[in-house]
Amino acid sequence: MNPTNVGAIFRSAAALGAEAIVLTEACADPLYRRSARVSMGTAFTLPYTYFDKDSDYMKLLKSSGFTTVCMALRDDAVPLYDPCLKEHGKLAVIFGTESTGIKDDTLSKSDYTVIIPMLNGVDSLNVAAASAVTFFELFSK
């Protein structure tokens, strides 16, 4: 994920109530100059960590009490506004890259696959925009 998207995600996460961010090594460094600038400094204040590419992070998240939510364009996805998503205390929201999305293995282990309903023939948003919409709906209302 490029530095601009990483910075924008940090900014939205901080502004809209996410408590922390977990990155994979496919993500740009949030402290990279462009990321930090776009984040408006939130990359220095919002806690974050990395999952090793070889770790079973879905298992780790679930064993830590998180309900996992994968954002993906799938026919079986529930809409972001579905009340079932608000019934869980700790949510871990997983976003994929814009080019390849989320791996099938990760999707199969997720508690929920969620889609942002779209209008006017648009099927998706940029990952930074999608994260902002998602954080607003799940964490700030």
Where does each model-flagged region fall?
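Short, charged, surface-exposed secondary-structure boundary motifs
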Residues: 60, 79-80, 124-128
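Acidic-residue sensor for enzyme active/binding pockets
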Residues: 25, 98, 137
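RNA substrate-binding interface of SAM-dependent RNA methyltransferases
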Residues: 1-76
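Active-site/ligand-binding-proximal alpha/beta "capping" segment
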Residues: 70-122
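Alpha-helix C-cap/termination motif
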Residues: 63-64, 86, 141
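Structured adenosyl-cofactor binding patch, chiefly the S-adenosyl-L-methionine
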Residues: 12-16, 30, 35-43, 104-141
